[in-house]
Amino acid sequence: MSVTVLLFAAYADALGRPSVDVPLAPGATVREVLDALKRMPGADRLPPSPLVAVNQRYARLSDTVHAGDEVAVIPPVAGG
């Protein structure tokens, strides 16, 4: 199966593109999506601890993804 990962800000900059299709085994989790990104060229520049949304809803690392899902990887937000 495959999911489309939307990359924002520093994530898009590090991987050199705004999105990527990630092949995964059925039953994969959000954590496995992030692990797949960490194996891509440029991953050494990925910020830690992103916010993740699956189909426009915030997700936990343990949530399962399904074929065709849209996974958004968003940098952590800081403010003051």
Whereabouts are the PLM-identified features?
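Ubiquitin-like/PB1-type beta-grasp interaction modules and other compact soluble beta-rich domains
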Residues: 1-79
